[in-house]
């Protein structure tokens, strides 16, 4: 077990986002978090990562490798968890390579900064995300999709035990969505745990082995992707009629009609 929630309740005035969520995430598991806009997916990611405290009372808790996130030092926590936020605060002054190297901070051993091994790891991540030709470009000059790939490369360089990814596919074209999801699947096979907020059910069906659904009333359901991804669950989750079709072994779901429209 790398990440666990116990009776986790998240709320803000007038709305409960999730109620009594108990979830265990093990090494090698790839989780999709699905739900409508505003249902609490981002708040849940932030709470799991220790950026927010659970506000559901003393019985609500999050454990990272058996301890509350706030107990770990920042460097220790960063070895356990890597977090991709929806939006990155502030502008980074340097180039892509310098930005991706920041992911090595939890592992730096020398007081003099990065070692050759750190630089090699960063360049391997840059190459994996098809950014080699942009490695020395200022990060601020990149397109939205290129910046998103640089953010994924930074997390690869960090190499945590568990990845918390809030909409990791935003801004990416179809080729690079496939590149990212293939990479995430490989990380899971290598023993990492991943939880990612997705809006495309097709990617969840193809690459994720577990699914957590957040409904608008604070209700949650979780289980294997095979159990969770079906028309009744998805129609209740998104409040629209879904069409299911199968290509090979992959199941796909697309919205068909909205009630009353």
List PLM regions with ranges:
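Catalytic Walker B motif of ABC-type/P-loop ATPase nucleotide-binding domains
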Residues: 163-167
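The feature captures the beta-strand-to-loop junction immediately N-terminal to the Walker
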Residues: 34-36
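Conserved structural motif at the start of ABC-family nucleotide-binding domains
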Residues: 3, 18-20
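ABC ATPase NBD Q-loop/coupling interface
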Residues: 61-76
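Helix-to-loop junction immediately C-terminal to a conserved catalytic motif
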Residues: 49
